[in-house]
UniProtKB/Swiss-Prot annotation:
Protein name from the UniProt record: Histone H2A
GO CC, alphabetical: nucleosome; nucleus
Source organism of this protein record: Emericella nidulans (strain FGSC A4 / ATCC 38163 / CBS 112.46 / NRRL 194 / M139) (Aspergillus nidulans)
Record carries keyword Flavoprotein: no
InterPro entries xref list: Histone-fold (IPR009072), Histone_H2A (IPR002119), Histone_H2A/H2B/H3 (IPR007125), Histone_H2A_C (IPR032454), Histone_H2A_CS (IPR032458)
Gene: htaA
Keywords linked to the UniProt accession: Acetylation, Chromosome, DNA damage, DNA repair, DNA-binding, Methylation, Nucleosome core, Nucleus, Phosphoprotein
Length: 132
């Protein structure tokens, strides 16, 4: 029985490989594809669209987490909290533009004191250096 209908997997077939691993991504391409189909965004979804979207989402997540990790390290902490996410997003010009209308719970506000509220700087008299 060397025909094609012997049942089971063929002996020469390769092991199954996920689309995420084929694309070198950590985000799930199959899940993104399913969500695109079920979300009624379009009647049909191409094969490359979920791969591209998963790559974009992975990049954004990595960018935000890197900046938040830097903010946590600046505050001498080892755990990222919502405050670090808020500081990372609001201090980055492009991320702030992208997520400008997003409210982060427990994020707080950026430290900012208006220039008029700061004490006036008075010039201090030098010790004889200006008398020439």
């Amino acid at each position: 029985m060397t025909g094609g209908k012997s049942g089971g997997k063929a002996s020469g077939s390769k092991n199954a490989q996920s689309r995420s691993s084929k694309a070198g991504l950590a985000f799930p391409v199959g899940r993104v594809h399913r969500l695109l189909r079920k979300g009624n965004y379009a009647q049909r979804v191409g094969a490359g669209a979920p791969v591209y979207l998963a790559a974009v989402l992975e990049y954004l997540a990595a960018e935000i987490l890197e900046l938040a990790g830097n903010a946590a390290r600046d505050n001498k902490k080892t755990r990222i909290i919502p405050r670090h996410l808020q500081l990372a997003i609001r201090n980055d010009e492009e991320l702030n533009k992208l997520l400008g209308h997003v409210t982060i719970a427990q994020g707080g506000v950026l430290p900012n004191i208006h220039q008029n509220l700061l004490p006036k700087k008075t010039p201090k008299a030098g010790k004889g250096s200006q008398e020439l």
